[in-house]
Amino acid sequence: MYPKAKATRVCSDAARINDLPDDLLATVLSFVPTKDAVATSILSKRWRPIWKRAVNLESDCVELCAICALDCFSFILMRSSKLRVLRFKQKRCCCNLLREKWKQPDFVPLSLYRSLEAFEWIGFKGREKTEKKAAFHILRNACNLKTMAITTSNTFQENTNILIDFDRMCTNCRISIKP
């Protein structure tokens, strides 16, 4: 398909990027959208932690795959001090597996505590040990959260139960569940 010289050039360009020190790669990732910086973690084992060292993941809105986000939740919030909108999309992605259990962070990042105003979870399934625990953590700790919107394919009864559980957690946040 491609001439041999073209393929060689692509490989040499990739090799040049991989020759850069991690600190420089982290600095470069500071200038790309948070979603793209996190996505670099699938490139190789070496790249997995690099995005976490990015100096400035400043964004007021972050949209991530829910499965990946559960793994790096604390790091995203820690590095995004002005985060106002957090959006999870439930989909199969780079990691291609479902989490069976979510580990709650040991601390509450300031962005979650102070600045998060809106949270949206598209494709929420309501799994007890993962999604519900993560959503409860956000509701419990996001003091300025005004809206939580959940889109789900669950039955009406399941959605009603989820809404009742979430309503108990928060009095000052508007929670909506859409099928």
Curated annotation (Swiss-Prot):
Coiled coil: none
Region forming the signal peptide: none
CDD domains: F-box_AtFBL13-like
Domain FBD: 101-152
One family name in Pfam for this protein: FBD
SUPFAM superfamilies (UniProt xref): F-box domain
Superkingdom of origin: Eukaryota
F-box domain ranges (all copies): 14-60
Stated name of the protein: Putative FBD-associated F-box protein At3g12840
